[in-house]
């Protein structure tokens, strides 16, 4: 038996084939549902940021307890208002049973930020103020449509939730990104 398709059948088949080819996907965007904490002491940006990440991962510690874990002190003693590094956050994470992540001496590339957020892992960032001094924050989201990143700032009088272009966050007239923790909890 011989079946013959007419011209209209060929046009329909071509239209269906073109429609079946996947097009460009919409740009991805994702924000993790963190509850960014305000730091309770003037030097505790690192403790507030680390405790924010720990709480996101289901741990229930106060900033004071987080500080004590970081410095190897008795859990409920009064922790001093000390500065710290991301390595100290890693120490606290380890003692909580959270994988401490990877310490990066520098900023993460945009694709690494998206990898972490897509995996459900906030990123800790240390920034350097151009006027002097450092600060810890938490990156918790991105938007590919405009290369935006979202970050939480623990400074009490600042906006808790912020966003900007990735390039702005890496470096601008006010601050630049110097150190990172990725793979926290991996």
Residue ranges: model-predicted function:
Residues 1-27:
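Secretory targeting and sorting signals
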Residues 16-18, 32, 183:
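Generic detector of low-complexity/intrinsically disordered segments
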Residues 22, 57-58, 96-97:
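A broad structural signal for alpha-helix termini and local helix breaks/kinks
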Residues 28-74:
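Active-site nucleophile-adjacent alpha helix/oxyanion-hole segment immediately C-terminal to the catalytic cysteine
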Residues 54, 65-186:
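Conserved active-site-adjacent core of cysteine acyl-enzyme catalytic domains
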């Amino acid at each position: 038996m011989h079946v013959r398709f007419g011209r209209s059948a060929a046009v329909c088949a071509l239209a269906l084939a073109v429609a079946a080819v996947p097009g460009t996907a919409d740009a991805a965007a994702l924000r993790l549902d963190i509850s960014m904490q305000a730091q309770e002491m003037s030097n505790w940006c690192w403790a507030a940021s680390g405790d924010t990440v720990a709480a996101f991962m289901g741990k229930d510690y106060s900033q004071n307890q987080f500080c004590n874990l970081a410095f190897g002190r008795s859990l409920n003693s009064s922790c001093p208002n000390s500065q710290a590094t991301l390595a100290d956050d890693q120490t606290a994470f380890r003692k909580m049973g959270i994988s401490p992540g990877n310490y990066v001496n520098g900023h993460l590339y945009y694709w690494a930020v998206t990898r972490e957020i897509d995996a459900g892992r906030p990123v800790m960032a240390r920034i350097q103020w151009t006027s002097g001094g450092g600060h810890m924050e938490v990156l918790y989201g991105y938007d590919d449509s405009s290369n935006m990143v979202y970050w939480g700032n623990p400074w009490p009088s600042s906006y808790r939730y912020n966003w900007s272009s990735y390039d702005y966050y890496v470096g601008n007239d006010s601050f630049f990104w110097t150190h990172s923790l990725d793979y926290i909890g991996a």
